[in-house]
């Protein structure tokens, strides 16, 4: 990986690292299951991987804002990018999805 690519992906990878820390430390203490599929932390990792740091964080904040008794939950997938829509590719739902960006 080039240094330029490393710097470009650094904010996204830092955010993903923070989400993994949350999943390993705080999430097990909460004990209550997420009302959505994929879970909010899985959603955040996917949003960051597919849309980058700024838009991914925006989508994540919007998703967390839905969390509460006023929303029924259910399936709420990360919106696709234009290229994914054109190729009809849906985002993969993977419990251990990383944010390693190689593009």
From Swiss-Prot:
Keyword Repeat attached: no
Keywords from the named record: Cell inner membrane, Cell membrane, Membrane
Localization in the cell: Cell inner membrane
Pfam families in alphabetical order: YidD
Cellular component, GO annotation: plasma membrane
Membrane topology summary: Peripheral membrane protein
Major localisation: membrane
Classification via InterPro entries: Membr_insert_effic_factor_YidD
Record carries keyword Signal: no
SMART domains: Haemolytic
Coiled coil: none
Role of this protein: Could be involved in insertion of integral membrane proteins into the membrane.
Family: Belongs to the UPF0161 family.
Name by which UniProt lists this protein: Putative membrane protein insertion efficiency factor
Species name: Chlamydia caviae (strain ATCC VR-813 / DSM 19441 / 03DC25 / GPIC) (Chlamydophila caviae)
């Amino acid at each position: 990986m080039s240094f330029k690519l490393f710097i470009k992906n650094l904010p996204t990878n830092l955010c993903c690292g923070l989400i993994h820390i949350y999943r390993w430390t705080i999430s097990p203490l909460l004990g209550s299951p997420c009302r959505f599929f994929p879970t909010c932390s899985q959603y955040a990792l996917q949003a960051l991987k597919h849309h980058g740091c700024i838009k991914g964080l925006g989508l994540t904040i919007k998703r967390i804002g839905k969390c509460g008794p006023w929303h029924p939950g259910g399936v709420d997938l990360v919106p696709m990018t234009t290229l994914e829509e054109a190729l009809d590719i849906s985002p993969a739902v993977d419990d251990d999805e990383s944010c390693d960006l190689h593009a």
